[in-house]
Amino acid sequence: TKVVAPWDVSAYILMHTIDGPHTDNLVPLSTSTTDVRYHLHLYDGTPVDSSTNIKTYGDGIFRSRLNDDGLIAGWKLAVQNMHAGDSVEVIIPYTQAYGTQSLGVIKPYSALRFNLRLVDIPFYELPNYGN
């Protein structure tokens, strides 16, 4: 499924649901903190990274706040279109990944393939509208 970013109609990712959607569960907001298990590959299948060895918040869990500037736009878009408990495969075009930058084995203009499982939303913050 093509998922288009509401903030930029030219920005998109491709998502394939593996397990889900768990529609009775929450969907994170842009300010939520999420717990995700992931495997990252280049589009050609070359393994790049995984949350497997992260132990800080539980076995293999990567915790992040979705409005963190350190996250790529495609990750944020994918996770905000998942329910807690969902597993998806996501193709992220280079424009929503690292763009023209390189990072380790990720070369400029690289599309990325993530396998994501949204394990939990430990902090479901609501947007602060100046209150």
Predicted segment positions?
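Cross-family detector of peptidyl-prolyl cis-trans isomerase
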Residues: 1-131
